[in-house]
């Protein structure tokens, strides 16, 4: 049996690092496809919200950026409301192999939520509201959090979709078990 490629080793290392950084990670099909529970950054209108963010790592990771998307609805100029697709220049255009998965959840996404770019929106309604009616924009975010982004809402969504038994939450694994996965 041959040893894993450098790209595969890097993928495994980055996923384990994300798990060890205390993010709740649910593996879907393999270490290249998983969901991370993401909490709204403090001091932003998104504070108090909780979202599931799907991450798909391409075969050429880390030289090609991961695909990320919100699984439950979020109201934001740079996130498509229907698909959850994130318009994030750092990830989509300027990603380099120097970045890792923790950068996405500890820097890129919090910055995007704190500082939307209404000039290049995926959600035109959110962009217009952000620019012209900021108080209404903040209220709409709060409404979305109450409806779609609470722990209770996530549980209801999981029950409604019938979570697959093949999913395993990495937060349930011991550190030794998580380290074994990178071998």
Swiss-Prot record:
Which pathway? Protein modification; protein ubiquitination
Which EC main class describes this enzyme? transferase
Under the cellular component aspect of Gene Ontology, which terms does the record hold?
A: cytosol; nucleus
Name the residue ranges with Low complexity bias: 163-172
Q: Which keywords describe this protein according to UniProt?
A: Acetylation, ATP-binding, Nucleotide-binding, Transferase, Ubl conjugation, Ubl conjugation pathway
Per the Swiss-Prot or TrEMBL record, the active site comprises 87 (glycyl thioester intermediate)
One Gene Ontology term of the biological-process aspect is: ubiquitin-dependent protein catabolic process
Q: Residue spans with biased composition (Acidic residues)?
A: 173-183
Name all UBC core domain ranges.
1-150
Q: What is its EC number?
A: 2.3.2.23, 2.3.2.24
Q: Give the region (Disordered) as residue ranges.
A: 152-183
User: Which Pfam families does the record cross-reference, listed alphabetically?
Assistant: UQ_con
Q: Which positions bear N6-acetyllysine? A: 60
Q: Where is the signal peptide?
A: none
InterPro entries of this UniProt entry? UBQ-conjugat_E2_core (IPR000608), UBQ-conjugating_AS (IPR023313), UBQ-conjugating_enzyme/RWD (IPR016135)
* The record's account of how the chain is modified after translation: Autoubiquitinated in vitro in the presence of NEDD4L.
GO molecular function terms here? ATP binding; ubiquitin conjugating enzyme activity; ubiquitin-protein transferase activity
Reactions catalysed, semicolon-separated, are: S-ubiquitinyl-[E1 ubiquitin-activating enzyme]-L-cysteine + [E2 ubiquitin-conjugating enzyme]-L-cysteine = [E1 ubiquitin-activating enzyme]-L-cysteine + S-ubiquitinyl-[E2 ubiquitin-conjugating enzyme]-L-cysteine; S-ubiquitinyl-[E1 ubiquitin-activating enzyme]-L-cysteine + [acceptor protein]-L-lysine = [E1 ubiquitin-activating enzyme]-L-cysteine + N(6)-monoubiquitinyl-[acceptor protein]-L-lysine
| Assembly behavior | Interacts with MAEA and WDR26, components of the CTLH complex that contains GID4, RANBP9 and/or RANBP10, MKLN1, MAEA, RMND5A (or alternatively its paralog RMND5B), GID8, ARMC8, WDR26 and YPEL5.
Report the function annotation for this chain: Accepts ubiquitin from the E1 complex and catalyzes its covalent attachment to other proteins. E2 ubiquitin conjugating enzyme that transfers ubiquitin to MAEA, a core component of the CTLH E3 ubiquitin-protein ligase complex. In vitro catalyzes 'Lys-11'- and 'Lys-48'-linked polyubiquitination. Capable, in vitro, to ubiquitinate histone H2A.
The family classification in the record reads: Belongs to the ubiquitin-conjugating enzyme family.
* PANTHER family, alphabetized: UBIQUITIN-CONJUGATING ENZYME E2
> What name is this protein filed under?
Ubiquitin-conjugating enzyme E2 H
Biological source species:
Homo sapiens (Human)
């Amino acid at each position: 049996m041959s040893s894993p490629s450098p790209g595969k080793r890097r993928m495994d290392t980055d996923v384990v690092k994300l798990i060890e950084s205390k993010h709740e990670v649910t593996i879907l099909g393999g270490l290249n496809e998983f969901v991370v529970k993401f909490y709204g950054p403090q001091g932003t209108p998104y504070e108090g919200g909780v979202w599931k963010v799907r991450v798909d790592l391409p075969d050429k990771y880390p030289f090609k950026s991961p695909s990320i998307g919100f699984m439950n609805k979020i109201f934001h100029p740079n996130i498509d409301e229907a698909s959850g697709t994130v318009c994030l220049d750092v990830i989509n255009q300027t990603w380099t192999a120097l970045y890792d998965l923790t950068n996405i959840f500890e820097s890129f996404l919090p910055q995007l939520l704190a500082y939307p770019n209404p000039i290049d929106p995926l959600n035109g309604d959110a962009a217009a509201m952000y620019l012209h009616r900021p108080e209404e924009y903040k209220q709409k975010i709060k409404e979305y959090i109450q409806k779609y982004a609470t722990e209770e809402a996530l549980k209801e969504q999981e029950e409604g979709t019938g979570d697959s038994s093949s999913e395993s939450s990495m937060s349930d694994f011991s550190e030794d078990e998580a380290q074994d996965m990178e071998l």
